[in-house]
Amino acid sequence: TPQIAADGLSKMINRVGKFNYDSHTHSLPKKRLNAFMDWEHNGYLLSLITRYVDGYTNQRPITGLGASLGYKNKVDSFLVFDISARKSIDLNEGNINFGIAIINALDESAPRLYDAPDFSFDTRVHDPRGRLVNLNLEYNF
């Protein structure tokens, strides 16, 4: 991100790994990794999705109240597992699929962020919803 230096010239600032409360750029964790694995057998499909977001630094000073509530300048990393299963059954004129998905299967809480609205989480990086279960029924003809 360019910034104006004291001498009036612009310089580049590395904002990776930071919350970036003082610029137009949003949080930029150093690492974001997604891994996918599927297994299919006899009309069953099992899937595992792993999502990882690296921790990062919040440069804004924390007040006494924030410190007393346990906030710190390091936003923790976030690792989430999603699991899904589907069964496909062939019918005379089409097929029917039954499915279940568990998003955030281990019910991980989004890391707390001192600077967030209501002292909660970083809305641009983390999903706060916890475990979700999705049932699916689909008929194809």
Please describe what each predicted stretch is.
Residues 50-63, 87-141:
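C-terminal beta-signal and adjacent terminal beta-strands/loops
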Residues 1-90, 115:
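C-terminal beta-barrel architecture of Gram-negative outer-membrane proteins
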